[in-house]
Amino acid sequence: MVPGLQVLLFLTLHLLQNTESSMVHLNSNGYEGVVIAINPSVPEDERLIPSIKEMVTQASTYLFEASQGRVYFRNISILVPMTWKSKPEYLMPKRESYDKADVIVADPHLQHGDDPYTLQYGQCGDRGQYIHFTPNFLLTDNLRIYGPRGRVFVHEWAHLRWGVFDEYNVDQPFYMSRKNTIEATRCSTRITGTNVVHNCERGNCVTRACRRDSKTRLYEPKCTFIPDKIQTAGASIMFMQNLNSVVEFCTEKNHNAEAPNLQNKMCNRRSTWDVIKTSADFQNAPPMRGTEAPPPPTFSLLKSRRRVVCLVLDKSGSMDKEDRLIRMNQAAELYLTQIVEKESMVGLVTFDSAAHIQNYLIKITSSSDYQKITANLPQQASGGTSICHGLQAGFQAITSSDQSTSGSEIVLLTDGEDNGIRSCFEAVSRSGAIIHTIALGPSAARELETLSDMTGGLRFYANKDLNSLIDAFSRISSTSGSVSQQALQLESKAFDVRAGAWINGTVPLDSTVGNDTFFVITWMVKKPEIILQDPKGKKYTTSDFQDDKLNIRSARLQIPGTAETGTWTYSITGTKSQLITMTVTTRARSPTMEPLLATAHMSQSTAQYPSRMIVYARVSQGFLPVLGANVTALIEAEHGHQVTLELWDNGAGADTVKNDGIYTRYFTDYHGNGRYSLKVRVQAQRNKTRLSLRQKNKSLYIPGYVENGKIVLNPPRPDVQEEAIEATVEDFNRVTSGGSFTVSGAPPDGDHARVFPPSKVTDLEAEFIGDYIHLTWTAPGKVLDNGRAHRYIIRMSQHPLDLQEDFNNATLVNASSLIPKEAGSKETFKFKPETFKIANGIQLYIAIQADNEASLTSEVSNIAQAVKLTSLEDSISALGDDISAISMTIWGLTVIFNSILN
C-alpha cells in the first residue's frame, strides 16, 4: 500500500470514531490521547496535578470493572497554561490545546458552582463536548456528596464518550409508578432509601416525613430521597456512583423504563448499558482475558506555548476571477490586524505552482509588526496550483525561525484543484502542525478538508457571500482558553447600496466587550461615505477611516481605548451603486470579565444524504447559558443557494434540553452535493434575553445517607436566591462562522417531505382535569422540525409497554378535530377517555405520532402519564398502604446533620 494512502486510511477511520476535536482513540482496550487542560485563569497549585493523576488512576480501575473488562485509560496528557512556571518535566504540546480538551479544569462562573458536569447536547449515543471539573472539586474531598473522584469521572466519561444521560431528575425527583406507588426517579429501583423533608429556619432544623402535594398527588416539592448507605444493588453509575455497591450500568434486566429521566426521554427508554455496548468503542473492544486489572495509566505533562501561525495563501491564476485575490487580501489583512493575538508569532507564504516565503515568523507586539506582513500580501495572480509546495514552505518558515511545526498552525487558502495534494499527507501527519483550510469557490481541491480533519484544524468554505472569507478568518482565533484574548465579531453584513441612497443600521456594543474595537468597510467600486456615531453622540466620518495601503478596497476605524457601551449607529451612501460590507470586531472589556460568546457547528462534518444534520449554536457568558436570544443560521450551498433557519432552545425537535443556551434545528434543505458553509447570527431580544445562573445536568448532589438506622444529612447545597436565578442581559450582537460541511448523494432540490418524516414529539405532557385528559406538546413539522405536519395520531393504554412496543394496537383517541400548527408552536388538546372505566387512582398512558402528506410517520413520542385522583384522602387510599409506610419510616430513625465533610 502507498504510505501516504495508509496514513490517510488510518486517520479517516480514526476520525469516524471521534467528535470534531477530540484526539481520543481506543487501542487494544486502552483509551489513548485523552487531554485534560487547565484554564489559564487557574492559579498554579502544586496539589492539582497529583489530584488529577489520582482521580484518573482510580477511574481507570472503576471503568474497567464497569465496562466488564473492556476499556481502561492507558495514557493521559495534562496541559498546563502558559502562565504557570516552566519545569523540566513539562513537554511541548503537539495538537493538544485547551479548546480541544476532553476535560477542562476551570473555575466556576459563580460561587458554589463546584458540581462536575459534561457539556452534552447531542442525541442519544452522540459524544459530548467536554467534562468540566473545578479546582475546588479536585482539591477538596467531598466523598459524602459525590463519592470518590474517580467514580465521578467515570459517570461523566459515560456522558462524554458514549452519549448516555442521567438517570435522576432534580426537577422531577418522584413519579407515580404503574403499581400505584410513588417512586424516586432512579435506576435501578433496587436502590433503597427514605423520603424526607429537611427544613432549617433561624438555626432550628426539623426533619419530617414527606407529605403529599394536593395538586400533583406526588410528594411536596422539598421532599428528598435519602439513600441507604449500605446497598445490595449494583446499578447504576448514571444514578448514584457514590454508593459503594454501585459498580455497573443499568442493563435491560434492571433498567427502570418508567422513571421520568433524561436517559429514558432521549434514548427511547433503552438502558444505559444497551446504548454503551452498541457504541463504536465497544464494537472493537471485546473483554480482556487473563488479567484481573489493567495497568495504571501513564501521564504526559505539557505546557502551552506562544501561538505560532503561518498563512499559506494561493495566488494562482484562477484567483483573478470574481475578485478572489482582493477578497482574500481584505480578509487576510483583517486577520493580521484585528484577530491575531499580540505576542503571537506570524509568518506568510504565497504559492502558485511554486511557493515563496514572504515573511519568516515575526513576533507581533505592535501595529508596525502587522504591517511588515500585510505589505507582502500578493498583488498579482498567476501560475498553477501546488498546495504541497505551499505547505512545505510554511513548515520551512516556521522551522527556520527556530520554532517547531508541532502544535503550530497553518491557515491554508486555495481556490484551485491540485492532483498532487495527497503526496504530502504523510509529511503533514509527521509535522504535528494544525492546518485550518479555507476552500474558496466550488473548484477548490476536494481533498482539502482531509488536511483539516487529519490535523484537528478548522475547515471553511467561501463562495458568493462577500463576508464569508472575513467570517472564516475571524473564526481562527486563540485556542488557549483565555477568552479575553479572543477577537469577537459583533457585525458582519453586506449591503447592495444604490447610488445616492443611504443605508442606516445599528450595532449594539455590550458592557462585556469594548477593547480593540474596529469598524471595517469594504467596497466594490468606490469608497463610500460613512457616518458613525457612538452612544454618547460622538461622530466619526469617512476621513476617520484609514484606507488600506494595498489598494484592496477596504478602510478601517479603530476606536481609541475602550469603546463606549450602548448602541452605535451608522449611515452609508455613495455616488456609485455597489456592494458594501460592514464588519465590527472587538475583544473583552476586562481580563476578569467573561464576554458574551457564540459558537456554532454542525452535528457532522460529512453527511451522506438522507442523513439528518443538526445545526448547533451555543450562546453563553462563561459557563452560564444565555436564554431567549434570537439565533439565526445562514447555510450556503456550494453554488450559492442560501437557507435561513431560526434556531430554537425549546427542548423539542433536535433540541435536547429546554433553556440550556444550546440553540438547534434540523437542516434538511439540501441543494445538491459538495461543500456547505454555516454562519450564525445572535441578537438579544429586548426584555426576553436573560442569563441563567443555574447550570443544568450537573452531578447529583447527595443530600445524605441512612446509616445504621440513622439519617445522616450532608450540608445542604448552597442555593442561588430565587431572585438571582436569572439576570437580564443588555442588547448585544454576535456573529460567528460554524465552518463548512460536505454532502454527497443529495438531489439538486426537491420535496424532502418524501424523505424525512416529522420529528419525534419529546415533550408530551398529560393531566386529568375533571373527566378530561389535557395534553400539551411542541408541534413537529412536515419535514422534521420544519413546516407543518399533516395530522396527529394519539393513542392510549393502561400499560406503557403497549405504547412503547405495539403503538399501532393501542386504543386510538379521536383527534380528527386537531389541526397541526406550525413547527415549534405549542399544541393543546383535551379528550374524554370513554373507552376506559374512569375510577379514582386509574393511570392512563398516552403517546403521539405525527405524519406528513407523503405518509411518512414520526417516531412514537415520549409516553405521558395521567392519573385520576379526586381528593388527597381518596388518593392515598387508592394508592395503597405502601407509600404511607415508606414515608413514615423516618419516625423510627434518628436524624443527624453532618456539618463536617469527610
Swiss-Prot record:
Query: Which residues bear sugar attachments?
Result: 75, 504, 515, 630, 687, 697, 809, 814
The Swiss-Prot or TrEMBL record annotates one GO molecular function as:
metallopeptidase activity
Residue stretches making up the VWFA domain:
308-476
EC numbers on record = 3.4.-.-
Q: Where is the site Cleavage?
A: 698-699
Q: Name the organs or tissues of expression.
A: Highly expressed in skin and spleen, and at lower levels in kidney and liver. Also detected in lung and brain. Not detected in lung or brain. In lung, localizes to respiratory epithelia of the bronchi and trachea and the submucosal glands.
Where does it localize? Cell membrane
- Coiled-coil residues are none
Renumbered to this chain, the signal peptide range is 1-21
Instruction: Mention one GO biological process in which this protein takes part, according to its record.
Output: chloride transport
UniProt record similarity statement: Belongs to the CLCR family.
Q: What is this protein called?
A: Calcium-activated chloride channel regulator 3A-1
